[in-house]
């Protein structure tokens, strides 16, 4: 009986280890599937482009996404720009200019980098492609305000202080911006815009992730009483 019991304990421990290994593999695969670089590589694999390819990467994962795109496409990328949070640029990327800017409140670097991106996509033709890599944090990092920068910073601080959620904040941001709510895509015309978007908002509303620079603006209003 003692030997049988010992055997059963060993067998149970072995099964637990096997289940743990399976669970670990599932978790590792799930994490790998949502890594920024993996998402970009999967999307760009075997993709062909006509004309110029201009890369614009915006958000807290912008550098990783741009690096993955550069590894995939190499010199097929004519030029590009990364706009990310301070401390998030790991190293230079060939043919791509990297900016670090303010988050969660936009700063002068946000405005300067966004203007550089606008100038980069101007003058393209219908055969060209803007590869737009978007991740969370883009609302503050990517901005050309319709009002003064100081006014926008003040409004952003007030929204954050009062406890507004991300959808409420981005709804207001879109109305004060020259690039949000699909306006950046309009600035890229007649070039084609290929967006790869990493969502950080529940439900994945494309018009709200980084305030939807390449997505048509949807109006959010309170329901009628």
List each model region and its residues.
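Short, Lys/Arg-enriched N-terminal segments with co-localized hydrophobic residues
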Residues: 4-14
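An N-terminal, well-structured beta->alpha segment
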Residues: 15-56, 64-65
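Short glycine-rich or small-residue beta-strand-to-loop segments that form or flank ligand, phosphate
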Residues: 52-58, 97-104, 131-143
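Conserved phosphate/anionic-ligand binding catalytic regions in large, soluble enzymes, centered on
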Residues: 57-65, 138, 206-215
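Active-site cofactor/substrate anionic-group-binding motifs, chiefly glycine-
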Residues: 66-88
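Glycine-rich oxoanion-binding loops at beta->alpha junctions
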Residues: 85-126, 172-173
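Glycine-rich, mobile lid/loop segments that gate access to catalytic sites or pores
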Residues: 127-205, 214
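Conserved small/polar residues in nucleotide/adenosyl-binding loops
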Residues: 220-225
């Amino acid at each position: 009986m003692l030997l049988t019991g010992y055997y059963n304990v060993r067998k149970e421990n072995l099964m637990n280890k096997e289940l743990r290994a399976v669970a670990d593999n599932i978790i590792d695969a799930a994490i790998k599937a949502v890594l920024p670089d993996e998402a970009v590589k999967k999307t760009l694999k075997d993709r062909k482009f006509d004309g110029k390819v201009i890369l614009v990467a915006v958000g807290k994962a912008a550098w990783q996404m741009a690096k993955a795109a550069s590894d995939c496409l190499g010199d097929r990328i004519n030029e590009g720009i990364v706009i990310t949070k301070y401390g998030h640029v790991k190293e230079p990327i060939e043919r791509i200019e990297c900016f670090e800017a303010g988050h969660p409140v936009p700063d002068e670097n946000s405005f300067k980098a966004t203007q550089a991106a606008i100038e980069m996509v101007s003058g393209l033709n219908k055969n060209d492609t803007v590869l737009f890599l978007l991740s969370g944090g883009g609302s503050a990092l990517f901005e050309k305000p319709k009002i003064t920068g100081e006014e926008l910073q003040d409004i952003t601080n007030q929204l954050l202080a009062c406890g507004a959620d991300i959808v409420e904040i981005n709804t207001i941001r879109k109305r004060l911006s020259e690039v949000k709510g699909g306006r950046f895509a309009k600035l890229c015309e007649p070039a084609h815009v290929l967006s790869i978007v990493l969502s950080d908002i529940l439900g994945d509303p494309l018009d709200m992730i980084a305030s939807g620079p390449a997505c048509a603006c949807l109006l959010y209003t309170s329901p009628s009483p």
